[in-house]
Design a protein with these regions (language model features):
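General helical secondary-structure elements
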Residues: 10-13, 34, 44
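N-terminal Sec-pathway targeting helices
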Residues: 2, 6-25
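Hydrophobic membrane-insertion alpha-helices, especially the h-region
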Residues: 19-38
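Cell-envelope/glycan interface and biosynthesis
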Residues: 38-198
Length: 198
């Protein structure tokens, strides 16, 4: 048996209560959003921005003020700088499209790839997780433009710089033995790299 309220004003009270609760909920969400925005906003900006490793166009291996360059492994950076100097003598300018990345920035790139390709397996062809990416440790760099990648594909071993993945002509890592033995065979893509299986 249903209980009804026939008291005067009972139906108005029932109509006002949800309205008041909705208003309070909206005020609470607004307050939380404001506080969160003040605290988390700058952190997110840092993760998304240069502090996290994001890079704009035209960055070179000599741009020490950029964390994506400054946080590269010192041996990798030395090799890149020597290669860039020699390439410049031939009219080729080597740009850094991506270098060191914070774990947060790398994870963001990974999640974007999962969303773009609609699967973790397909995304893994292009973007590693923060736990496995050599960018996070500063041991990998993505270079450009295409003239630079072509130049490094011909001369990279002289500097111990090797293209690691066949599907990523821009991705280079330091391979110390390359100077004597040449670059090792490339993996088809990152899914075939044992380091990515951790």
């Amino acid at each position: 048996m249903a209980v009804t309220c026939n008291a005067p004003g009972g139906s108005a009270a029932r109509r006002i209560r949800p309205t008041v609760l909705t208003a309070l909920l909206l005020v609470g969400v607004a307050l939380i959003g404001t506080v969160t925005g003040r605290v988390v906003g700058p952190l997110l900006a840092a993760v998304r921005g240069e502090a996290g490793g994001a890079i704009g166009r035209g960055v070179t291996v000599f741009d020490n003020e950029r964390p994506a360059v400054a946080n590269l492994d010192p041996d990798l950076l030395r090799a890149l700088r020597q290669a860039a100097k020699d390439a410049a003598r031939e009219g080729v300018k080597i740009h850094i499209n991506s270098g060191w990345r914070s774990p947060e920035y790398q994870e963001r790139l990974h999640l974007q790839a999962v969303w773009k390709y609609r699967s973790k397996e397909k995304a893994a062809r292009w973007v590693a997780t923060a736990d496995t990416s050599p960018h996070v440790s500063g041991h990998a760099v993505d270079i450009g433009p295409s003239r630079a990648t072509a130049w490094l594909s011909r001369h990279g071993a002289e500097y111990r710089l090797c293209q690691v993945y066949r599907n990523e002509p821009w991705h280079y890592e330091l391979r110390p033995r390359a100077i004597n033995d040449g670059c090792p065979p490339m993996y088809a893509d990152p899914r075939h790299d044992p380091r990515m299986q951790q």
